[in-house]
UniProtKB/Swiss-Prot annotation:
UniProt key word DNA repair: no
Involved pathway(s): Membrane lipid metabolism; glycerophospholipid metabolism
Top-level taxon of origin: Bacteria
Name of the protein in its database record: Glycerol-3-phosphate dehydrogenase [NAD(P)+]
Family to which this protein belongs: Belongs to the NAD-dependent glycerol-3-phosphate dehydrogenase family.
Catalysis: reaction(s): sn-glycerol 3-phosphate + NAD(+) = dihydroxyacetone phosphate + NADH + H(+); sn-glycerol 3-phosphate + NADP(+) = dihydroxyacetone phosphate + NADPH + H(+)
Origin species: Corynebacterium urealyticum (strain ATCC 43042 / DSM 7109)
Protein's GO biological process: carbohydrate metabolic process; glycerol-3-phosphate biosynthetic process; glycerol-3-phosphate catabolic process; glycerophospholipid metabolic process; phospholipid biosynthetic process
């Protein structure tokens, strides 16, 4: 058994907390709101984010960060990428000296160009080998329901990766390990942008052929960027790359795809957020960061560029898709 703290009681944070608890570990979930913590403790549910999914007895909740982090050997950060730095700044003094810190956030800081694992190491003042990334084709609702799924635990320190792997392995949840943190994070961040493009195409009324084209060419541009930055090509073909991309680009449970679909139907950013319970999709936040990273690396990412144009430059979704098809022909 391993003491686990999960910081963030949204749908994915709560789901990951459930998986760790189902694996036999005592888990404390930090929630921002009293009513969420009370629901978890009194009713063994997080009705606000996971509906009627029953949570295990080994999972408790608190609104006190220090209490959640006390004694935790594994600290899971489940807050959005855009708030990770500020939240972690107030939590770092409570993190145990040798705890393994796991990032669930998929994003790149626009101001710094840093990946989330880099932000964590910087803010927490820890070595990069203490930071792991959990990523893969993991739609929260399906995992919370106990549907079979696999994930990737990426960490520079293979021993830590295997430690987390052992702690999070549940009957329905199979974790694999990797030391390619960079590749896992680039894939996870970029797939949110590609999923927006897939949703935009669906909102324009295009079908399976278009979706498959977006997925395939999206993987191609993601791979170009990742390899240029030094990632392992195998990561792009695995759970963090192709696996996560397919799930996010095809499922109606995907926030990014749903958000993109509203954009494709003609909604603006604010109106599109209604499709995702008022939350702006991570891909909207990340697309400019990915674009900036690609330009700095000298990598062409036309689908990412198209998403930026739709989200921030008032470009017509249909015109942008036609422009993509009209690009200079070349070998695959």
């Amino acid at each position: 058994m391993v003491q686990v703290a999960v910081m963030g009681a949204g749908s994915w944070g709560t789901t990951v907390a459930k998986v760790f608890a189902d694996s036999g570990n005592p888990v404390t979930l930090w929630a921002r709101r009293d009513e969420v913590a009370d629901d978890v403790n009194d009713n063994h549910r997080n009705s606000a984010y996971l509906g009627d999914v029953d949570l295990p007895e080994g999972l408790s909740a608190t609104t006190d960060p220090a209490a959640a982090l006390h004694g935790a050997e594994i600290v899971v950060l489940g807050v959005p990428s855009q708030t990770l730095r500020s939240n972690l700044s107030s939590w770092r003094e409570h993190i145990e000296p040798n705890a393994t810190i796991i990032s669930l956030a998929k994003g790149i800081e626009y101001e710094t160009g840093m990946r989330m694992s880099q932000v964590i190491a910087d803010v927490a003042g820890v070595g990069s080998d203490r930071v792991a990334v959990l990523t893969g084709p993991n739609l929260a609702k399906e995992v919370a329901q106990g549907q079979p799924a696999a994930t990737l635990i990426a960490c520079e320190d293979d021993e830590r990766a295997r430690f987390v792997q052992s702690a999070v392995a549940a009957p329905y949840f199979r974790p694999y390990t990797s030391q390619d943190v960079l590749g896992a994070e680039v894939a996870g961040t970029s797939k949110n942008v590609i999923a927006l493009a897939a949703g935009i195409a669906a909102g324009c009324g295009f079908g399976a052929n278009t979706n498959a084209t977006v997925i395939t060419r999206g993987l191609a541009e993601t791979t170009r960027l990742a390899l240029q930055l030094g990632a392992d090509a195998r990561t792009m073909a695995g759970l963090a790359g192709m696996g996560d991309l397919v799930a996010t680009c095809t499922s109606p449970l995907s926030r990014n795809r749903s958000f993109g679909q509203r954009l494709g139907e003609g909604a603006g950013l604010e109106a599109a957020a209604e499709a995702t319970k008022g939350q702006v999709a991570e891909g909207v936040v990340s697309c400019r960061s990915v674009q900036a990273l690609a330009r700095k690396a000298g990598v062409e990412m036309p689908i990412t560029d198209a998403v930026v144009q739709v989200c921030y430059e008032d470009a017509s979704p249909k015109e942008i898709i036609n422009q993509l098809l009209g690009r200079t022909r070349k070998p695959e």
